[in-house]
């Protein structure tokens, strides 16, 4: 797995991104691992260990472990496809 979507359960911006993540997976051959960080300290530690994430300061945060590209905040489907390399 190389594509990750870090989110918080009650995060309204994250909720807006969920359907776009689903759309990305349906329209391409990619799979995005969803990682909840507000109620899981281990997942939060994993997110905080990404050096490129330090300037973001929150969720949603999308991380491509192959290209080392991240997206901080909400994004369009076109931005997601570019980020995923799809």
Question: Which functions belong to the PLM regions below?
Answer:
Residues 12-13, 41-42, 78:
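Short alpha-helical
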Residues 15-19, 45, 75:
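Generic recognition of short, well-ordered alpha-helical segments
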Residues 34-38:
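Residue-level recognition of beta-strand->loop/alpha-helix junctions
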Residues 40-57:
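Short Fe-S-cluster ligation motifs
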Residues 58-86:
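Non-catalytic, surface beta->alpha helical segment in thiol-disulfide oxidoreductase systems
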């Amino acid at each position: 797995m190389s594509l990750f979507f870090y989110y918080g359960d009650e995060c309204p911006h994250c909720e807006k991104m969920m359907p776009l993540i689903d759309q990305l997976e349906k329209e391409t051959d990619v799979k995005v691992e969803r990682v909840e960080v507000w109620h899981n300290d281990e997942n939060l530690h994993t997110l905080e260990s990404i050096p490129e994430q330090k300037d973001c300061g929150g969720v949603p945060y999308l991380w491509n472990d192959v290209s080392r590209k991240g997206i901080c905040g909400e994004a369009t489907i076109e931005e997601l496809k570019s980020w995923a390399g799809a």
